[in-house]
From Swiss-Prot:
It comes from Methanococcus maripaludis (strain C5 / ATCC BAA-1333). This is Large ribosomal subunit protein uL5. Transmembrane segments: none annotated. GO terms for molecular function: rRNA binding; structural constituent of ribosome; tRNA binding. The keyword rRNA-binding applies. This is one of the proteins that bind and probably mediate the attachment of the 5S RNA into the large ribosomal subunit, where it forms part of the central protuberance. In the 70S ribosome it contacts protein S13 of the 30S subunit (bridge B1b), connecting the 2 subunits; this bridge is implicated in subunit movement. May contact the P site tRNA; the 5S rRNA and some of its associated proteins might help stabilize positioning of ribosome-bound tRNAs. GO terms for biological process: translation. Keywords: Ribonucleoprotein, Ribosomal protein, RNA-binding, rRNA-binding, tRNA-binding. Part of the 50S ribosomal subunit; contacts the 5S rRNA and probably tRNA. Forms a bridge to the 30S subunit in the 70S ribosome. InterPro entries: Ribosomal_uL5 (IPR002132), Ribosomal_uL5_arc (IPR022804), Ribosomal_uL5_C (IPR031309), Ribosomal_uL5_CS (IPR020929), Ribosomal_uL5_dom_sf (IPR022803), Ribosomal_uL5_N (IPR031310). Disulfide bonds: none annotated. Belongs to the universal ribosomal protein uL5 family.
Length: 181
């Protein structure tokens, strides 16, 4: 029985996107970080959170707790729309998604080297080019029991998202090819 048949028969077993985390590692504070915040806000429609340096690195001029990156967490419809655009940009630069990018519970990550590959984006010399990491986290209906405050419980192994389920979901929903090695 294929995953599609199981998901139609038992909708609670169908995986869904819990969240998408978009990370801009700018590497420096100042104007480049401010411009990057505008770029990420334009791409996602949400204002980013600044990420801080964890340690001092004098070779790069970075001090501890200095803002050097940006991140945004997307959920729901915004997450699905952004992922469609991110896959378009990912394919535009000639990259493919490998099965090794998926972990054992179905989460996966990929990088988009240039933000100008997104639909509707054009190169602006005053902005430059920014790359980003996109991390996708999956869950199924009923996962709330492991994170709620009262009567917290564990998720049984048979209800966890598997690597193969996540690959099947991405291939059918987003029409993206996943290369198995």
């Amino acid at each position: 029985m294929s995953f599609q048949e199981v998901w139609e028969k038992e909708p609670m077993k169908k995986p869904r996107i819990q969240k998408i985390t978009v990370n801009f590692g700018v590497g420096e504070a100042g104007d480049r970080l401010t411009i990057g915040a505008k770029v990420i806000e334009e791409l996602t429609g949400q204002s980013p959170v600044r990420t801080l340096a964890k340690q001092t690195n004098p070779a790069y001029g970075i001090r501890k707790k200095l803002p050097i990156g940006l991140k945004v967490t997307l959920r729901g419809k915004n997450a699905e729309e952004f992922l469609k655009n991110a896959f378009t940009a990912f394919k535009a630069c000639g990259k493919v998604l490998y099965a090794s990018s998926f972990d054992q519970v179905g989460n996966f990550s990929f990088g988009v080297p240039e933000h100008i590959d997104f639909p509707g984006q054009k190169y602006d010399p005053s902005v430059g080019i920014y790359g980003m990491d996109v991390c996708v986290t999956f869950d199924k209906a009923g996962y709330r029991v492991k994170s709620r405050k009262l009567k917290r419980s564990h998720i049984p192994k048979k209800h966890l998202v598997t690597k193969d389920e996540a690959i099947e979901y991405i291939q059918t929903k987003f029409d993206t090819e996943v290369v198995r090695e």
